[in-house]
Amino acid sequence: PLRLVGSEMCIRDSNQLVVRDMVSSQSLSSLLSTLLYILGFTLAIEAAGMGIIFLGIHGTMDMTVREELAFSAFHSISAFCNAGFSTLPGNLGNEMVMHGHNTIYITISFLIILGGIGFPILVNLYETVTYEVKRIWHHYIKGNKRMRRKIHLYNLNTRIVLIMTAILLIVGTVVIVVLEWNNAFAGMSPTDKWVQAFFNATCPRTAGFSSVG
């Protein structure tokens, strides 16, 4: 019985630690507020993505403003959730977006990346950026020299994920450019080719986004 109790306690403690790591909360008693924080964080990123996509397509795709907003919201959510669904025939290889809409491809690519690296990594990045902004503000704007830079801003998990993500994206982009420069990307400008290569190097994270065959 004691062994069973001990095992149950170990499992329970282990599960609590896993949940705490997943929601990046210092106390499980604040789970609800943490989940609301995650929801708000997610909606903020998706709203930013929606806004950028909307600005990129506004007045260029023969849609009403309502349709443009719906298109932007759907693709922002689909990208951040790594769903990969598109409302366009032919996915994002549709002629309506293939030319002159690099902003869409870049925005969707970064939404895919942010949605794929995980919430704890996003929080660590957010905290790091926030700290650096405050440090620069106090050091250079207000002239307060006492606020020193923290040595360990990124935790080990964040470093590993970011490094591996960068390596995979860089290698994937270069390989796709080399293989498809005069094939699937024939007729495109050099800028379009690099954007399409980056987008298609990012897309394997999702279930369905594509722009070339």
Task: Set out the residue ranges of the language-model regions.
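Membrane-proximal intracellular helices of multi-pass ion channels
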Residues: 3, 7-213
